[in-house]
A protein has these predicted regions:
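Bacterial Sec-dependent N-terminal signal peptides
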Residues: 1-65
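C-terminal non-catalytic alpha-helical accessory regions
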Residues: 66, 216-218, 530-684, 873-874, ...
Length: 1006
């Protein structure tokens, strides 16, 4: 009886059934039902095979796409990688690439670190063992090519592929070898990726060195028989840009390696390969020069298998800093052409045969525009001269040398005005430096032969304020924007600015995983990505809990970068916003601390670096800034606690320094010294301050006796700031309405304005007013919570009173109650505001071709919604077109203002803006252009742009009418794809200032 192998190509678009071996003996007869579910051309087909004859298997089914082929439990037919008898030897050929031999040496070390048993590594010599692991490159390794000629291995679907590997188990490949696991690469990196895939599957994280992730120890390791591949990458070039590297990375590299030399870069190259990246823009801040600082840098890069290039303003494989060493004079082609051409020729000559992608084009000196106006003809002429140099030096047509043109900042103006480059040059589009794509190719441009790329940012130095300290990137936004790019045909180069590499570990992993196979990570897979990543770093220890920490701390940081936070960013007066933000971080820190305390010692360093430290640092920062906000507000109110918060700010400011010291000195015996040295407190311009500067605080003189003050939550404000202080001549403040549907609980804050202890009492003058306490003694301040007993409250509108007494004074606070509301369902108005998250729609209408999906966790407060496919054509809003609906209740008729909270997506179509339609009930839909007024481009730091990237949100307003109190329906129609809806806030006359917008309203089922 023959074994049946099921073969799928890497795109899961074909099915081949082939006969592989005849069974050697019949063991027994049994029934097996095999159901295979595959995806072909986006259709699911179910194939069922019923076998009635049991067999002895000599090979198993091929498994595709990141399937685990490792087991720690032995089973019949499994290949032993390591057990108590030792680790299986490794074998490779000296004829293979140096990078492949180096990678298999890494595998040898990895197996030893995981199992404690070092496998023997043989080069060209067959080990004295019945089993062996072989690695080699098709067409390069004599060993592999010999096995192919003898038909001992099957390389179907491998020849001519880009970076593809196959890992397969075979019987009797070599005389004396009974079985082998063979890793075959279609090219150098294909083999290397296959080797590192095995390392990762046995429990070695790509971040084992860069984040001290522990090796996941195993006593026994077995490989499940079969043939495995991850196919070809979806994106050809996938890489990082080490940028903005001073002071942190530069000082660290100088201390640990003597600078950005090949010893430093060896760690970078290995990290890239273990993450299946292949492309690098190296560090380039003054005075760094990749090729000149250490002549071994490019040689080692090529040996490892890294494709080198240079940044958007460094053409022809030359660091811009070399121009100063070269003494080239003015960086101006019109006045200094000969010097520039000579300079560029030197870059191509030095490049030699090293695998590279040559940046072409020209920008101004120091990351600036080349000319004041858009000089299309000049730039086209420059590129033609550069391509002539490439052809002359290499001795082959320019199109045979990979090239890229970076459409960055002002260069996009050239593209927008019709400039195009030769068909063999990759066109690298860019985001706006803040993670928002600026332009994508139109369908008619997709025939550009070498395709398109994206240059993305996790780090940036520039307006409105640099962000460099910690990870502020949500992988959900990366997914949404890069999925947009991929579906618009951008598949040839994905590059991301990662700053100092640390602490961008999580988004780097995601960026590379997504670039390899975007189809494998859909929106609903994003929550599990955090879990998988946590497992990769920490095993099964609290993986789900760690995933939650990762998803939330990045969400909180993405609301506003730490460098841009101010004492008044979050409201101290409305919606308890500032308090909620601090409490959210404190809850994260508490959970993180609990996990840290439970982890094995071997895992604590990595957990501290990847999870705990950024949470602790950002928790401290947010608490400090809110404390500074309290100091200012409480000082204005004359509170004694103003001085307390001045001291609190100082305490937390110095704690920030201590946390930095701890990271530098205590962690791994100082391994990461300097890595957290980026200043992050006290920005007054776009550029970082020389040193962290504590937020300004003030101290007040308090009375020598006790003095009573008070403040009501959400207080109406005829009085100064909504509170009453003796001698101010203020009106008695009032709460906003209480109602039986929302059943609010608001606080009354009693505070002391003197040095002595204040005794106070609070008394409700109506029996339906409930107080959390009636009296107290305070040195500073205390909250008394007010609610209503609705069984006793009178019907209709009425106002009760609370009397506050203390220090010989009595004050009256009004308590308005509204107990005459209409029947309510949907999201319920609360004092003139209705708020709901976009993902919490009450109804959605999809069409055959277009549907709404939720992107979990994307956004500042909850999740977001988008339409798919993201490259759909524009729709006309009507009763049958895609829309979402939200039921809500308002208590009065009148004008409503709807605020749509949108991710700050740019008009990447460069047409007339991205549009949606909106209506309440049966209104005629209003067409809203989310990009209206965006005339001045972002690179000129337009006001519209600086605000939306600072806030990480764009709010679009529209006016509507509620013709009656009661239930209504908000309708949102898709017109253009690409718009990300985060939340909606309806102002029915009670909107109050806050950064995040009103929290979601209560929802009542119909």
């Amino acid at each position: 009886m023959a074994d049946i192998i099921i073969l799928f190509d890497e795109n899961l678009t074909g099915l081949v059934l082939s006969i592989h071996y005849f069974a050697l003996s019949i063991i027994h007869i049994f029934n097996i039902v095999l159901i295979i579910l595959i995806k072909i051309n986006k259709m699911r087909i179910l194939f069922a095979f019923l076998f009635f004859i049991g067999i002895y298997c000599t090979a198993d089914a091929i498994v595709i796409d990141s399937t685990s082929y490792i087991s720690t439990n032995v089973s019949e037919g499994y290949f032993t990688l390591s057990d108590s008898n030792g680790s299986t030897p490794l074998l490779t050929s000296s004829s293979d690439y140096a990078g492949v031999i180096r990678a298999i040496e890494d595998l040898q070390k990895d197996i030893f670190k995981v199992t404690g048993r070092r496998p023997e590594l043989k080069i060209d010599t067959i080990p004295a063992s019945s089993k062996v692991i072989i690695a080699g490159t098709l067409g390069k390794s004599i060993l592999i090519d010999t096995l192919v000629k003898k038909q001992a291995i099957d390389t179907t679907g491998l020849t001519g592929k880009w970076e593809k590997f196959i890992l397969q188990t075979v019987k009797d490949p070599i005389p004396g070898i009974e079985s082998a696991v063979i890793i075959i690469g279609s090219d150098k990196r294909g083999t290397i990726y296959g080797i590192y895939d095995l390392s990762e599957q046995i429990g070695v994280s790509p971040w084992y060195w860069w984040a001290d992730v522990p090796f996941q120890k195993k006593d026994e390791i077995y490989i499940i028989p079969g043939t495995y591949t991850d196919g070809e990458p979806a994106v050809k070039y996938r890489g990082i840009f080490i940028n903005d590297e001073a002071p942190a990375l530069r000082n660290w590299a100088k201390e640990k390696f003597g600078g950005f030399n090949h010893k430093f870069y060896e760690n970078v190259f290995e990290l890239l390969l273990r993450n299946r990246a292949n492309y690098l823009w190296p560090a380039m801040w003054i005075p760094t020069m990749f090729n000149e600082d250490d002549p071994l840098n490019p040689k080692v890069a090529d040996e490892y298998g890294i494709v080198m290039s240079t940044s958007h303003h460094e053409p022809m494989m030359r660091s811009h800093n070399e121009w100063y060493r070269f003494n080239g004079g003015e960086w101006n082609y019109e006045t200094n052409k000969d010097k520039l051409l000579e300079f560029w020729r030197g870059g191509i000559e030095r490049m030699g045969n090293y695998e590279s992608v040559v940046t072409v084009g020209m920008r101004g000196d120091g990351d600036e525009a080349m000319t004041e106006e858009t000089a299309v003809d000049l730039l086209k002429h420059i590129i033609s001269k550069q391509r002539k140099i490439i052809a002359d030096v290499t001795g082959k047509p320019a199109q045979e040398t990979p090239q890229v043109w970076a459409v960055y900042k002002e260069v996009q103006d050239y593209y927008d005005k019709g400039m195009r480059v030769d068909d063999d040059i990759i066109i690298l589009f860019c985001d706006d430096n803040w993670g928002n794509l600026r332009i994508l190719p139109k369908k008619e441009d997709l025939d550009h032969k070498t395709g398109y790329g994206i240059y993305y940012h996790f780090d940036y130095v520039g307006a409105p304020v640099s962000y460099r300290w910690l990870n502020t990137t949500q992988i959900e936004r990366v997914w949404e924007q890069m999925n947009l790019a991929y579906e618009h045909g951008v598949k040839d180069l994905w590059l991301v600015n990662v700053g100092d590499i640390k602490p961008m570990e999580l988004p780097i992993s995601f960026f590379m995983d997504f670039a390899w196979n975007p189809d494998a990570i859909q929106a609903n897979d994003l929550p599990n990505y955090y879990v998988s990543w946590a497992k990769q770093q920490f095993g099964d220890y609290h993986a789900k809990e760690i995933a939650e920490l990762l998803s939330l701390y990045t969400k909180y940081n993405a609301r506003r970068t730490p460098e841009m936070l101010k004492p008044d960013t979050y409201s101290l007066k409305n919606f308890r916003e500032a308090y909620r933000v601090v409490e959210e971080f404190k809850q994260l820190l508490e959970k993180s601390t609990n996990i840290y305390d439970q982890l094995p010692e071997s895992h604590k360093s990595a957990f501290y670096q990847l999870v705990h430290s950024p949470i602790e640092m950002c928790c401290n920062l947010n608490e400090m800034l809110v404390a500074a906000g309290k100091n200012k507000l409480y000082g204005e109110q004359g509170r004694a606690s103003a001085n307390l918060y001045a001291e609190k700010v100082k305490e937390l400011f110095f704690k920030d320094a201590e946390l930095t010291r701890k990271f530098h000195e205590d962690l791994e015996d100082g391994k990461w010294n300097h890595m957290m040295s980026q200043t992050h407190i006290g920005y007054t311009t776009w550029n970082h301050p020389r040193t962290n500067k504590m937020p300004a605080v003030s101290y007040i003189h308090t009375d020598t006796s006790a003095l009573l003050g008070y403040m009501v939550e959400h207080g109406l404000e005829p009085a100064w700031h909504g509170f009453s202080v003796e001698g101010q001549g203020c009106f008695s403040p009032s709460f906003i309405d209480f109602d039986p549907i929302n059943q609010q609980s608001y606080y009354l804050e009693i505070f002391n304005r003197g040095d002595k202890t204040l005794d106070y009492s609070v008394k409700a003058k109506n029996d339906w007013i409930q107080l959390s306490k009636n009296e107290g003694s305070i040195q500073y301040d205390e909250k008394v919570y007010v609610s209503i007993d609705w069984d006793k409250a009178p019907i209709g509108k009425t106002t009760g009173e609370i009397a506050i007494t203390g220090a010989g004074k009595e004050y009256i606070v009004k308590v308005p109650v509204r107990n005459d509301l209409p029947k309510a369902s949907g999201f319920i108005e609360n004092n003139g505001v209705v708020s709901f998250e976009a993902a919490n729609y009450t109804n959605k209408i999809d069409t055959k071709d277009i549907h709404w999906i939720v992107v979990p966790n994307l956004g500042r407060t909850h999740s977001s919604i988008i339409v798919e496919p993201v490259n759909s054509v524009r729709q006309k809003p009507d009763n049958s077109s895609p829309r979402v609906e939200y039921e809500f209740t308002v208590f009065d008729s009148g004008e409503l203002t709807v605020e749509a909270f949108l991710s700050p997506t740019q008009d990447f179509k460069k047409h007339d803006g991205l549009k949606y339609a909106i209506a309440i009930d049966d209104e005629e839909p209003q067409i809203i252009n989310m990009n209206e007024g965006e005339i001045i481009p972002d690179y000129k730091y337009a006001e519209w742009w600086t605000k939306v990237v600072a806030d990480h949100i764009k709010i679009k307003k529209s006016k509507h009418k509620a013709d009656k109190p009661g239930k209504h329906t908000l309708k949102i129609w898709m017109i253009d794809p690409g718009i990300v809806f985060q939340k909606f806030v309806i102002d029915a006359g009670g909107q109050r200032r806050s950064y995040l917008g009103a929290p979601e309203s209560n929802y009542v089922e119909p």
